[in-house]
Amino acid sequence: FPTPVAGIPIRAFDASAERLLKMGFRLAVADQVEPAEEAEGLVRREVTQLLTPGTLTQEALLPREANYLAAIATGDGWGLAFLDVSTGEFKGTLLKSKSALYDELFRHRPAEVLLAPELRENEAFVAEFRKRFPVMLSEAPFEPQGEGPLALRRAQGALLAYARATQGGALSVRPFRLYDPGAFVRLPEASLKALEVFEPLRGQDTLFGVLDETRTAPGRRLLQAWLRHPLLERGPLEARLDRVERF
């Protein structure tokens, strides 16, 4: 079947790719893989990159905040896992309700989401999900990997399979980290919106924008993570304050 292709000058690639990704396209980049003088007929080209919103590693295309790919599976609860391919951050949690799932998704704001087959086939769920989260929905095999509850292992497997497929097999990922949302102040979606933590209700100012004096991309992402997950326990709070006092 015919496949639309486009030639983009190499100097304009980043700007063109960014625009196409924002329009909802997945990009397959085909590069010349043999010298033109050695070619017999057409110069051979192969797909060398697959670009999707949640699997970017190119600095010029990455947003300033964490760029999460998320996967959701069901079973013994709602298994939710996140992977930032650009940094290797890999974490997840098991949730008891759909409302808790939506709160975690809103806090992390993934760029792309993988849905398990039982969710993709649920038209009511997909319609509700798209209304709440206007992000790219993609497919991957949900073969269990790692340890823990089945739903969470399925989500882990989907993230790794999809990331490897888009990165051509080359993938550097940190060990999976199980996190407990109960260790942090619970900030539901409505509270984050009302407090204008990341998105303004009026004007342009947000809490994050006022506090953001970071100098590096990792520092900016860390500040975002702290605001998304305020600490509850006294020990970690005092340790963080001690580190800040040194400056």
Spell out what each predicted region is.
Residues 1-247:
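Charged catalytic and DNA/RNA-contacting regions of genome-maintenance
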